[in-house]
Amino acid sequence: STERQVSLTSGTGVCRALRQRGHQAILVDMFLGLESYTGRLADVFDAPDGLCGDNRVLSTEPDLEAVRRSRRDQGPSLLGKDVLAVCAMADLVFLALHGSCGEDGRIQATLDLLGVPYTGSGYLGSGMAMDKSVTKRIMDSAGIPTAPWHDVRYTREDIPRLAQELPVPCAVKIINGGSSIGVELPDTREELAQVPAGALSTAGT
């Protein structure tokens, strides 16, 4: 997802903190898996530095196409080499994933089916919370105060009309994104007219 680097940064921090406290912990890149690990899978939890690299949040979004091309296995699976195998070996999987696939219930459901314990919410809660429109509707139906919102589905041709119809100032966010990626805060209609095209690009729709 566009939050790939945020996930790696979070995972690195968690992994190193656990190792400092005496736990056998490793960082596993969900997409690339253990492609760069050359040891025996049975010994992976003894890997130096827990397979943590120099991961930090970047000021630019990751080039996801470049990431896809970098993986030796060019198959359609979003799970890299030995990811499920090493998860099954662990006592607990700490999910430090952000964004689609990591927070939307899909990886949670996969681990549920495999009987692998993990941290965080289950697949149903994750899926509902990741969709901002669903979350807003649930909060409304439960009488929980939430800021007014508009669920807008549009194409590029709709942008001029939306820029005139939607209230400003406002906050614009893709429906299934997190970590503030893709959030815009236009104060004027001119600024609002520039926002939806970028949101379309980030959301991929």
What is each residue range found by the language model?
Residues A47, E61, G75, L166-V168, ...:
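Intrinsic-disorder/low-complexity coil detector
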Residues V93, S100-C101, P167-P169, L192:
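Short secondary-structure boundary micro-motifs
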Residues R21, M89, E165, G198-T202:
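Alpha-helix C-cap/termination motif
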